Amino acid sequence: YIKDDLRTSGDAVGVDAGLIWKYAQDSRLKPSLGLSIMNIGDLNFDRAGKIPQTVNVGVSINPTISMFRSLIVGLDYIDVFNNFKQDKDMAKRLRYGAELQLFDIWPVELALRAGMYESSPTLGADLRLLFITASYAMYTEEVGAYAGQDKIKRQLLTLNIGW
């Protein structure tokens, strides 16, 4: 006899807030700092449990490189105060990466991305031709208690039509 314990449900309303500060002075690196607070005051689903408030911080640079359209390099630290208390592994909460937009000349645009998410590599690309954009992303999701324990590889392929 198997009993299903996943039948508990609940309702809650979440509120998030965030700030981005961009360095206003003329700078070759064009740095930015970010802060987000998610699930302000926690999300309480009564018997179904709660999702705690989290604070995230990030920093990025967007240097000018003459041979490319743009380059963005960023670093985020998720759940600064470890409110989820799932583990003490800082590597699972550190995310960093870069996006290189090779060109954006109508009707073609090409961007490449690479980084690290939960201590595993990520890759991605966007190709736009006229009004159609094809996007690919590959990343690994951590489901274990510490970085590297139990990983699931995921791939996404999307096709968008827009103008």
Regions found by a protein language model. Give the residues of each.
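Outer-membrane beta-barrel porins/channels
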Residues: 1-163
